[in-house]
Amino acid sequence: MFLCTRQIDIHARFGIQRIAFLSLVATIFTFLVSYEVMYYFLDTPLSDRNFFVLIVFILLMYPIHKIVHLLFFLPYYKSFKIHKLSSKKWVPYFNTYVNTPVHKIYFCINLILPIFFLSGIFIMLSIYLPQYGHYFMFLLSLNIGCSMMDILYLKILLFSNDGHYVEEHQSGLHILNKVDNPYTQH
């Protein structure tokens, strides 16, 4: 049996405007820094060929980010829930979450997994295909921008001493403690 010790709603705590602003600033800052680092180490001339492939990957960045989260939660696939965040039919903006208690450490690893996994892929691709390094650095910065909400949740979870389990809901996270049910017979 689990008891909720704390509820976290990032939207109510920070607000959509602040989260969007933090995401935009993180994206711009990450691109400026990563591009300068890449430009310092690589001496290959940059190419603007295959620009439409970049546009496709820009549009797919959010779904790819979500898929990386869901792949790590594959042991909990029976508890996957999908909630459409946009009322417009043509906007594919979904919130996917696991509706079962997950250990806090496992959940924290899942929060940072897309940051390290996708960033590592983009850095490796910029090393192996240096002529498109600026494309990969832009995709890396978009990934960091998409991860801003994950970083905010991670910060709150790491500094929370309340419980050892986390359960996701449409409204945010619930931090839970596992307790023995006093009404069960031994």
Model-assigned labels for residue ranges:
Residues T44-L59:
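Loop-to-helix transition at the N-terminal end of transmembrane alpha-helices
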Residues H69-I82, F159-S160:
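Catalytic Zn2+-binding segment of zinc metalloproteases
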Residues Y35, V179-H186:
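Hydrophobic alpha-helical transmembrane segments
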Residues M1-M38, K89-L176:
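Metalloprotease/metallohydrolase-associated module, dominated by Zn2+-dependent proteases
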Residues M61-L74, P114:
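Active-site recognition of the HExxH zinc-binding catalytic motif
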Residues Y62-I67, S86-N95:
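Hydrophobic, membrane-facing alpha-helical anchors
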Residues F57-M61, I144-S147:
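Alpha-helical transmembrane segments
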